[in-house]
Design a protein with these regions (language model features):
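Conserved GHKL (Bergerat-fold) ATPase module
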Residues: 1-207
Length: 207
C-alpha cells in the first residue's frame, strides 16, 4: 500500500472504545438493570439474563474498574477442554485481551465481564501479563470481590443462590479438590449441601 492510500490491514488491530463512555466507567447509580442486562447480551456473554452482577472500582496502589457477571447457565462448552475462562482486559480505553485467564481463579471460571486499569501498559504481551505484579494485585481483589458477592447472594437471596449452585457448584468443589484443600478456607462457605431430609440445599454454616 502507498502512503496516500493506506490499507486497513497495515494497522495493528486493536479495539478502541468509541466516544461514548463505556458502561463500566459510569456511576452505577446512573445505570438501570436493563442497562446491565443489555450490555451482557450485546457482548455475547450469554443469551439469557445473568443471575447477578457486581460493578465496582478500586483505588489504591493499583487502580481499576470492573463489571463482572454471574451467568444463569453454563455455556455449552463449559466442561470441555475448549472452554476459555477470563475477563476482557482494557487499558487506556484499548482492549488488550479478550480473555485474560489470570484475572480469575479456576473456582470462578464461569464469570464474564470487563476490567480496565490504566496502570497496565498498552504493549504488554500475554507472557508479560502472567508475570505482572499489578495484574496479580488486580486478580486478588477481583476474586475477593466475587467471593464476597456470592456470599451476599447466598445470605440475601438463598433461592437464587441455590439455582446458581446447582449450575456451578461442582466447579467450586473441583477447585477445592484440585488445590488439595489449599483454598478450602476461602471457598468452603460457598458450598451447599442437601439437608438431612434432602428437601433443600443449605450452607455449611446451617448444616
Amino acid at each position: 500500500s502507498t502512503d496516500e492510500d493506506p490499507k486497513y490491514e497495515d494497522y495493528k488491530e486493536i479495539e478502541i472504545l468509541n466516544s461514548e463512555t463505556p458502561i463500566w466507567k459510569k456511576d452505577k447509580n446512573d445505570l438501570t438493570d436493563e442497562d446491565y442486562i443489555n450490555f451482557y447480551q450485546d457482548q455475547h456473554f450469554g443469551f439469557d439474563e445473568p443471575i447477578s452482577w457486581l460493578h465496582f472500582k478500586i483505588e489504591g496502589a493499583v487502580q481499576f474498574k470492573a463489571l463482572i457477571y454471574i451467568p444463569k447457565k453454563a455455556p455449552f462448552d463449559y466442561y470441555s477442554k475448549d472452554y476459555q475462562k477470563g475477563l476482557q482486559l482494557y487499558t487506556h480505553g484499548v482492549k488488550i485481551m479478550d480473555r485474560s485467564e489470570d484475572l480469575v481463579e479456576d473456582a470462578f471460571s464461569f464469570v464474564k465481564g470487563v476490567v480496565e486499569s490504566d496502570d497496565l501498559t498498552l504493549n504488554i504481551s500475554r507472557e508479560t501479563l502472567q508475570q505482572d505484579r499489578q495484574l496479580r494485585v488486580i486478580s486478588k481483589q477481583i476474586n475477593k470481590k466475587i467471593s464476597r458477592h456470592l456470599l451476599d447472594l447466598q445470605k440475601n437471596e438463598p433461592e437464587k443462590y441455590a439455582d446458581f449452585f446447582k449450575e456451578f457448584g461442582n466447579n467450586i468443589k473441583m477447585a477445592i479438590y484440585e488445590s488439595f484443600g489449599a483454598n478450602k478456607e476461602d471457598l468452603q462457605d460457598l458450598l451447599l449441601f442437601y439437608s438431612k431430609n434432602e428437601d433443600k440445599l443449605i450452607s455449611l454454616r446451617e448444616y
